[in-house]
Amino acid sequence: HNELPFLYGGDNWPYDAMCERQRRKGVYASQYLTPDRTARQMAALAVRYFDNDSRVVDACCGTGQLTRALILEGVHPSAILGFDTDAELVDLYARFYSEAAALRMQFREIDFRCENVIANPPFEIAECVSFLQWLSCTQHSGDRAVLLLPYGFIDKPCPKSVQETMRHFIVRHRTPMQEPFARTNCRAEIVVVERA
């Protein structure tokens, strides 16, 4: 819209601005920002694996990097609901994607069925396990999720809660993330799971 007070040559200002914020303040609350190519790959998998008649939930949505990719893949914004705990990010999300529903909530507070989930959830072990436990409670058999998880997380033997939770899911697809996160050295993989 040419409304920035400086010359910007990129095509994804929200992502670039959040990367700059991380550069200045560091990673906060396990917010590893989903890079463009990874977001597009996840969105393509979502379109391939999801039930097209059901809403898509962008869990831990941040500024909407995954929602942006879903829209580019042809998902209508009105079919998307994004939520995050960070009020500033949810406000930005609501401004960028006014046709999508936006909620400021923790995933633990979401108690409705989420048939189709796309997410880059928190990477700390306890938080990631909690996210997967929440997912197993809000999904029914056959529901699916496309997740960006720490590399090898779903194979971890310890803590036991990882394998106990993963028993609720069938892994349909997994592939290593092909590009690095900005400002972090964490490795990740894209995992498509189906609720057993």
Kindly give the residue locations of the regions a language model identified.
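Class I S-adenosyl-L-methionine-dependent methyltransferase catalytic core
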Residues: 1-196
